[in-house]
Amino acid sequence: MELVKICPEIGIVMDVDTGIVAEMRKDILVVDLNPIKEEINKLETLSKAFENSLDPRSAPLKAYDGRDNIYSVGGLFQSAFFGFWISLSILTLGLILVIGLYPKLIGL
């Protein structure tokens, strides 16, 4: 929304979008809401993508075609990764415990 001051002395302005000529009042603040609407639309798009990310069958917002089950595949790899490291650490702790309790097993 753009305003053109026709006569600043008496406060007459014209709205460029509609072509309406009117008197500008001192007690009313005119604010352009178009940039705010654009930011709200961006936030709505991002929130919709975040909501869709909770469904493992959906694709991410900026993904290539054919990436429909990417979240479920990522979940499988994440589970395998953490499962490997957790089981390796439990095995190492168990081995240290067995060696500590029975040092004759390794010849000490």
Curated annotation (Swiss-Prot):
Coiled-coil intervals: none
Enzyme Commission no: 7.2.1.4
Ranges that cross the membrane: 81-101
Keywords on record: Cell membrane, Membrane, Methanogenesis, Methyltransferase, One-carbon metabolism, Transferase, Translocase, Transmembrane, Transmembrane helix
Pfam families listed in its UniProt record: MtrB (PF05440)
GO biological process: methanogenesis, from carbon dioxide; methylation; one-carbon metabolic process
Functional note: Part of a complex that catalyzes the formation of methyl-coenzyme M and tetrahydromethanopterin from coenzyme M and methyl-tetrahydromethanopterin. This is an energy-conserving, sodium-ion translocating step.
Family as reported in the entry's similarity comment: Belongs to the MtrB family.
Name by which UniProt lists this protein: Tetrahydromethanopterin S-methyltransferase subunit B
Species in which this protein is naturally found: Methanococcus aeolicus (strain ATCC BAA-1280 / DSM 17508 / OCM 812 / Nankai-3)
This protein's encoding gene: mtrB
